[in-house]
Each structure stands twice: as C-alpha cells, then as structure tokens.
Regions:
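C-terminal cap of metal-dependent C-N hydrolases
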Residues: 9, 27-30, 340, 356-393
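Metal-coordinating catalytic core of metallo-dependent amide/deamination hydrolases
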Residues: 102-107, 111-240, 310
Length: 393
C-alpha cells in the first residue's frame, strides 16, 4: 500500500478553490480532500501552490513530429516517445491522445502510422511509462489506403482500445480550416518560399488531386457511421465550418465537433448535442492562425467544452493562465477546460477532477501573472514522482 499527501495546497475543485488543502492519495486514488487536513507520514508541502487534476489532452500531433527534428534526421521511435513524454509531462499532461494520421501523403504513410501505434501500445505497458498514452486515429477522408489501414488497425486493437477515438478529416482547400484558401496560400508562401503565383498554382493542383479522389470519402462513411452507431468508436467531425457541416456530421453519428471554425458551426454543434473541442494555442494567442473563429470567443459564449493542445502541449496550461488573466473564465472554469471537460468529451469517467474516489493524476503549479510553472506531477498506478523543483533541489 502506498499512501501520501500533498499539504498546504491551493486545490482547484470543480466549482471552487480550497485554500490550505490537504489531498491524501492511496494506491493512486484520492481518498480525502480537506482544509488544513493532517499530513500522512509521507507528504509533499506545496507551499501554497495550485494543485489541480492532471491535464487530459484529446489531440496532440507532437509525437508524429518528434522523430523528425530536422528534414534529414530520423530518430528511433522508442527514443522519440520517451522524449516527447518528458516534454508533455513537464507541461502537466497526464493523459494524452496521440494524433496519428492514416494516409499516404507527404511525411505521413500508412506504414508509419502503424509503427507509431505499435510503439504507443508497447510503451504503454512498460514499467517506466510516466503518463497515460492513448491514440487518436486520424483518417484523411479521401485516402483509400488510409481508410483500409485504419479499419484493419481498429479491429486488431480491440483488446487494448475497446472504443477508439477517430477523427474524420477533410483538409481539401476551400472548406474546414482553410475555407478561405488564401490562408493556406500564405502558409505555403512562408513555409516553402514560394511566390504568390506559385502558391496559388500549388493550391489549384491540390484541388485537382483532391477532387479526383473525392469518391473515397463516400466509400468510408458507411463503415464509420455504422461503427459510431454501434458504439464501437467515438467519432469526431474535424473542422466543421458551417451548420450544414454539423448537420452532416450528425448523420455520421459523430458525437464531437473538433475545432469548429465559426460561431455558427459551434452553435449548431451545441444545439445538436455534440461536444465541442477548441485549440489551446488559439485560446493562448487569442486568435486562430488560419483566420477562423477565436477559441476565446467560443469559450465566452459557452460553446467550448474543452481544449486540446493540437501542436503545442504547454499551451494547455498557458491557456488556463491567459483565460483567467483576461477575465474570460474563473480559475476553476479554466482548469475544467483542460481536465474534466476533455475527459467528459472522450468518455473518460475516472479522472479529471479532484474528488474522492477518482484517479489521482495531480499537477502542482504556479502562475506568475498568466505564465505557468509546473512544480510537480503525479500519476496513478505508479510511484509518486515529482520534479526537482518540488524536492527543493
């Protein structure tokens, strides 16, 4: 039996802040939360720092990028997942869905997707694992190879992932994230050193190629729709831009609208009973990098159920600080957006709140104005581990 406590903390509970809180943990489960509660034999003094649930991230693309720090460099996947884990754990993330793209396009291949998923499952059962690793299966809506591989992968993974999270994504210019193709053209100009004319021609070519495989989207939908209806998958509609997009997603039996690009789409998602996920980097910056609706606006309108890191893990805690500083949220409300909100969205019921009986994934941190510093991270089903900062080294 392992029992310890975190004393003298500022505990962020679901609807309130509890000062001078003692949180007692036994065998990875919270067994008591009390103001000025007694310390156990083993304890950590938080010295007034914030104690909050571990962050739950429903969409992170970071692991896919970790093995490729330079265009000509390829790192081993077993090293890469531990390297990336260290980064996200230092950002206070304790449960993470790795976005793995099933498609044959550019740097993404079906072969690499399967290799990524293999190492995630393998490392998850390692005695050295330091967080809860899960998979977000991302399907390019128009890629037949990706669809066939994803179907086979999901069936083979049933024992380790009974109800996988699947995102159905169509990044064809002129819809979704790049409904205004000018933003994609600007991105191509900056990232590939093209002129405006070259970027326009490049996007034109993408449209021709994507239109040629449009039929693959219709071939994938019956299987996805059936699997979602049977409860075999949790289906995300990615980048819905209009109420019509949301209405279509409802016919797929999607339950999540991920990254709605307009207020109207988010309102339609709420009216249809879909959970809504926004990007933490968007909330941190106060605006979308591709000209779409601000996550802060959706949060202020009550149209966001949770944030995900997308491409920047530390943005989760950064968004908490920013949302509180600019008055969009109270601290408990902002914390909910990166903990219980995402948990509820993806169907995880045993964590995400500081409550007796729940999994003791816990983060101790401070905010200097709106800028976070993580002092300690604990995860359930493992020995209590904390950063050197918490040990006073």
């Amino acid at each position: 039996m392992t029992i310890f406590s975190i004393i003298n903390s500022t505990a962020i509970l679901p609807t309130q802040i509890l000062e001078n809180a003692t949180i007692t943990i036994e065998d990875g489960v919270i067994i008591d939360i009390a103001e000025n509660g007694p310390a156990t034999e083993r304890y950590v003094n938080a010295e007034g720092a914030i104690c909050m649930p571990g962050i739950i991230d429903s969409h992170s693309d970071g692991f896919e990028m970790e093995p490729r720090p330079r265009p000509s460099v390829r790192l081993p996947l077993d090293f890469s997942i531990q390297s990336f884990e260290a980064k996200v754990r230092a950002a206070g993330v304790t449960t993470l869905f790795h976005g793995i793209g099933f498609e044959n396009d550019g740097n993404r291949t079906v072969e690499s997707a399967n290799a990524y998923v293999n190492i995630i499952h393998e490392y998850s059962s390692s005695p050295t694992v330091m967080m809860n690793h899960r998979v977000l299966y991302r399907l390019d809506a128009r890629d037949a190879d990706g669809f066939n591989a994803l179907c086979a992968r999901i069936e083979s993974d049933r024992q380790v992932d009974a109800k996988p999270l699947v995102s159905f994504e169509d990044h064809t210019p002129g819809q979704g994230q790049y409904r205004d193709r000018t933003y994609l053209e600007n991105w191509i100009m900056g990232s590939r050193n093209m002129t405006r004319e070259e970027a326009v021609a490049h996007v034109d070519q993408i449209l021709i190629e994507r239109e040629a495989v449009r039929h693959n989207k219709e071939l994938a939908l019956p299987w996805l729709t059936e699997q979602a209806a049977l409860g075999n998958i949790t289906l995300m509609a990615h980048d819905p831009a209009t109420p019509e997009d949301v209405a279509e997603a409802v016919t797929w039996n999607a339950s999540i609208a991920e990254f709605p690009t307009s207020v109207e789409a988010a309102q339609a998602a709420r009216a249809a009973g879909l959970r809504t996920v926004c990007g933490a980097p968007n909330a941190l910056r106060g605006s979308s990098h591709s000209g779409n609706v601000s996550a802060t606006e959706l949060i202020s309108l009550g149209l966001c159920d949770g944030l995900s890191s997308d491409y920047l893990p530390f943005a989760m805690l950064g968004a908490v600080g920013t949302l509180v500083k600019n008055g969009t949220c109270t601290l408990p409300e902002a914390v909910r957006l990166v903990t219980y909100g995402p948990a509820e969205t993806v169907g995880i019921t045993d964590r995400g709140r500081l409550e007796v009986g729940l999994v003791a994934d816990v983060v101790v941190c401070r905010f200097n104005r709106n800028l976070p510093s993580v002092l300690g991270v604990w995860r359930a089903n493992g020995s209590p581990l904390q950063s050197l900062a918490m040990q006073g080294v």
